[in-house]
Amino acid sequence: MMASLATSISGSFRILVKSSSTRNGFPVISDQNPSFVLFANKRRHISRTAIFHRSAISGSSQGEKISPLASGVSSGLYSAQTFDLTPQNVDLVLEDVRPFLISDGGNVDVVSVEDGVVSLKLQGACTSCPSSSTTMTMGIERVLKEKFGDALKDIRQVFDEEVKQITVEAVNAHLDILRPAIKNYGGSVEVLSVEGEDCVVKYVGPESIGMGIQAAIKEKFKDISNVTFTS
């Protein structure tokens, strides 16, 4: 006599188990659907075949790129996946946020992770703009809380010391936050001169990143109002 039991398991799996008694082996179940995986466990008189069906995980459609800072949008990592709270994992999760910060002339660095408290430093245009608190609270904090859950006790913003002197070396050092992204696009950036309100920069790369460079320099160095590119 054939007995069947269907059980629905929460998550992305469904299992259907069919059992039958037989003397000459076990029943053969044929299914042409590649989303089914068959597992057979033969016994002397009883055989069981379990069919696991993995529900399809819907992905975002190709096309316009949506910022993970937007409400209701999870990061590129699976939203169900959580991580141990370490500096390396915090940095990994923030990789989904950085492209959007960099496009606005900013970035974020992980300063420390201690006793559930994550200290971050916003860079470039994100540092002192009026929306910096919104960026931290509505964007970065939301993504981190989603990935680290109750292990994350607090997120603190660390601020840079006030810039006292504007030099070519100081501006170049500040642009280090953008150089990895520029290099990924096959570009380069170097500050050639700083004279009063004028800053001349040798830049090769995408126009969108170039606008971010200009914003990063002006936000950090308030006395610079003109940033000129040369190749």
UniProtKB/Swiss-Prot annotation:
Location within or outside the cell: Plastid, Chloroplast stroma
Molecular function per GO: iron ion binding; iron-sulfur cluster binding; structural molecule activity
Family (UniProt): Belongs to the NifU family.
PANTHER family: IRON-SULFUR CLUSTER SCAFFOLD PROTEIN NFU-RELATED, NIFU-LIKE PROTEIN 1, CHLOROPLASTIC
Lineage, opening ranks: Eukaryota, Viridiplantae, Streptophyta, Embryophyta, Tracheophyta
Function description: Molecular scaffold for [Fe-S] cluster assembly of chloroplastic iron-sulfur proteins.
Primary localisation category: plastid
GO cellular component assignments: chloroplast; chloroplast stroma
Tissue expression from the record: Predominantly expressed in floral stalks and siliques. Expressed in leaves, cauline leaves, flower stalks and flowers (at protein level).
Transmembrane segments: none
Protein's UniProt name: NifU-like protein 1, chloroplastic
Keyword terms: Chloroplast, Disulfide bond, Plastid, Transit peptide
Organism from which the protein derives: Arabidopsis thaliana
Gene: NIFU1
InterPro entries: FSCA_dom_sf, NIF_FeS_clus_asmbl_NifU_C
Subunit composition and interactions: Homodimer; disulfide-linked.
Transit peptide start-stop: 1-69
GO biological processes: iron-sulfur cluster assembly
